[in-house]
Amino acid sequence: MKILYYDCFCGISGDMNLAALIDLGVPKEYLMEELSKVNLNSEYEMKIERSVKLGITGTRVDVKLNESSHGEEEHGHDHYHHHRKLKDIEKIINSSHLSDKVKNISLGMFMKIAEAEAKIHGKSLCEVHFHEVGAIDSIVDLVGAAICIDYLKVDRIIASPVQVGGGFVECSHGIIPVPAPATTEILKNIPISTGIVQFETTTPTGAAILAVNVEEFTSKIDFSIEKIGYGIGHRDLEIPNVLRVYLGEQERSEKVEEQYILETNIDDMNPEFYEYVQERLFEVGALDVFKTPIYMKKGRPGINLSVLISEKGEKDVLDVIFEETTSIGVRKHKVEKIMLNRDFSKVKTEYGDITVKKSYYKGKLVKYKPEYEECKAIAKEKNISIDKIYKVVYRQDLN
């Protein structure tokens, strides 16, 4: 499995991301050729060069605008404030000759920033005027990111917790705290760290690249590193102003996720309540809920309630446990969940199309299962046994 890993020890910005991925191996000629399909070549020039920050050698990207009036992005290159709206950005991308995949990735990142800006300024998506995103160089940053990600053809993208910096920064709205409100909104439910330097180390553009493309945020590296790229930032800081990226190979074909188990022992709750509690836990994002009969002190029978969650699901699950059960304490365990690769397909039967889930181990199909809820609904509608529907699905696929 091919892995792209972002090591954001000094945050991430759009230009540093482009520089790091070029340094990793994306040919600059390929990037420039693809960017030319956006039909904005006359509005900017891209300078790509080798650079050094505190002894670390990497690639630096600088986008210079062919405009007389310039602003400045806090982390990197210049910005000219066109004040474009989302529909303008969408028109530019959709009218380009980029591949559909690159278009979709690009539009996803722009939408992420648009939603954040709309919420911060209390406006609808169609009303938002982009300052950072409306600038040509930010279009280059985000479309360029999509081009590079598509070129690398990785199976998974992972990132470390994101350093966002600290202090205050001046923008078109005045002096605002770091991380900027838009950056904070984009990075919701993503692990961050702050204050390593008094500077904006992560910009909204960089945050959107991570929020849209990264599947997992973890400091753990469980793959062999094959290539390393360094994207050099423009500002001199106390630490290396560098974005480091790894291209690696994970030997196991199974997907591994870090998850958590929250568990509590209960011996004084009405057992009728467990069904409701379980429903509420799933509603707030629990990945799994299970109950184990136990004997507690003084021989009292009880239940061990266990809830499997992702890192970002803890708060809502704890709210349900403490508000809906008699528990006054919860234990938390970090676990690794190893999952087989899987896909879904439709099987045509005499009762209609039914979804089946296929699971693979070491590249071989090892599990094949119809979706229970679909089979149950058909069984009720047709007044036939669910076992018969399962057999029809298996027989149809064998044929």
From Swiss-Prot:
The main enzyme category here is lyase
What processes in GO biological process is this protein linked to? protein maturation
Q: Which domain of life is it from?
A: Bacteria
Q: Which GO terms describe its molecular function?
A: lyase activity; nickel cation binding
Describe the family membership recorded for this protein in Swiss-Prot or TrEMBL: Belongs to the LarC family.
HAMAP family from the xrefs? LarC (MF_01074)
The entry's function note states: Involved in the biosynthesis of a nickel-pincer cofactor ((SCS)Ni(II) pincer complex). Binds Ni(2+), and functions in nickel delivery to pyridinium-3,5-bisthiocarboxylic acid mononucleotide (P2TMN), to form the mature cofactor. Is thus probably required for the activation of nickel-pincer cofactor-dependent enzymes.
This chain's protein is named: Pyridinium-3,5-bisthiocarboxylic acid mononucleotide nickel insertion protein
